[in-house]
Amino acid sequence: MTRRESRSRAILSIALVSQLALPGPLGATTLAPSQPPDDDATTIHVLNRLTFGPSSADLEKVRRLGVSEWIDAQLRPGTSADTALATRLAPLVTLSMGAVELREKYEIPPNIRQQIQKARAERDASAGKEGAGAPGERYEQMDPKARREEREAMVRRFPQLATLLGTPQKVVAELQAGKVLRAAFAERQLDEVMADFWFNHFNVFARKGPVEFMVGDYERTLRERSFGKFEDLLVAVAQSPAMLFYLDNWQSTDPNFSPRDLYRAQARTRMPANGSPRRRPNAMVPEMMGGGANNQAKQPPKRTFGINENYARELMELHTLGVDGGYVQADVVEVAKAFTGWTILGEGPGGPRRNKESRFAFAAPAHVKGDKRVLGVTIKDGGEKEGLEILHLLATHPSTARFISSKLVRRFVADHPPEGLVDRAAATFAKTGGDIREVLRTILKSEEFLGPAYRAAKVKTPFEFVVSAVRASGAEVRNPQVLAQKISAMGMPLYLQQPPTGYKDAAEEWISTTSLLERMNFALDLSAGRLRGVSLKGAGRSADNKAPTLDTVAARILPAGLSPKSRETLEAEAQKDGNDPAKLVGLVLGSPEFQRR
């Protein structure tokens, strides 16, 4: 890009950002004279909310079925395989592997990892660079050239790293690529929208320890339960190795806990006639608490054990009740006690070990015994059962019904959820025992959702914007990693949001002159074929191959239409290059109207 082009794009972004930042929706009165009729406006609105952006095929399908029947079809469980999507995902070999296989194939041994981190720290210090962020996170945010230089420098210093350096990055990179491909090309779009919603709600950071190897299994857990009962989803998350490790509950114990208690439990392991020990179901073994086959005779590692409140706090504040849900610090402490001993087979409170079983286990000797008092309810001493009772208490609490309903209404209707709809959704949640599918039906069949009041009221996140641009333009994607890198550059690295809050679902998080410039740059690069492995055939050309205009391009890829102000601004910019077809596509994709859904 020349300096002149860069300056022109910056000026254009400044001219457009005020329109994107206007409060409230871009209602029908602001649209161009070519705006769609009311039935089509409803169709476009529904597709903007229940998919990652309308495609021409989606529009035809909804027009054929009708909006109500199409919504019902999206809410029904899928019955057929998406073979086209499976073909696209096939080259991403790590997506079909579980945590055990991933760790066996890709995990860098701790001593090698320490050498890498030390070398990077020394390099950054000598170059006077800030050390913000985890090393893996900084690596993910590098451009491809910087990554290549990083690898070459490490291998020159440590030749033995040649076959190891960067292997965990492959796992996360393929997770990101798979997420982009599913969102862009899956037939069942609402499944993908809900998978994204629940991962953000139950966020984990893939760069914390071995979590990167657990995320695939974790996301499958969320997908399988994304339309079911909320309590089932909550229990599955609580017992998932990814969440247990991310929020440190895997090492939460009774302060008086001693690993020796688990060595005694080893005696319960039956020794068969062939002399090979076989674990009895649910029997605890030394590896979980930091021991292992090679050090059982050694003294347990010296470590200060105790209760960790991280999961208990986020369980109530972020996963169920909400920050104003009626709990106090004493409840956090009691819940934390109840979840002591909820750990990971192969990790355990003694520290991560090379045993890679990576599945939930309950370590009874590490559990704080005695009754607990949570939200005014006495939870009787019962080991693992205490945690399950608390999850039931929270899943069925009125504050949870309202908090989850409010987040769903925010996702599908407006940043400031209409109270009446939240009330009705929460009532459905309570009546059905937390049936997510029925809560969604209440929201998606409501006047607030289907009516004109909240159309175009949501601003797309970087992930939604990039994927919707691919879908609207009909781009062919051979290299989804380049799209994931662009999403990361816009401030939303997939699976790499470190705080448990996830990414904010609100316009103010994503609107600025800088962000709109980044989006415009992406749109123009996409339409011009400057993204490696992503291409547009006949960009801007209509079926009859007539010379395109801004209006004809907008009608094809932005059916809701441009506002008169945007049309005027973009028309002036397009004429600078003689209405170049590719540039017309890029300008429409970068318009304020395309940033909204």
Residue ranges and their predicted role:
Residues 2-14:
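Bacterial N-terminal signal peptides that target proteins for export
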Residues 22-33, 178, 318:
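Short, contiguous pre-domain boundary segments
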Residues 29-39, 44-58, 84-96, 100-106, ...:
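Flexible, low-complexity segments enriched for small/polar residues
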Residues 51, 63-66, 75, 237-239, ...:
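A mature extracytoplasmic/lumenal domain signature
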Residues 56-197, 201, 207-225, 246-250, ...:
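N-terminal accessory alpha/beta regions
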Residues 193-194, 203, 217-218, 242-243, ...:
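Surface-exposed interaction patches
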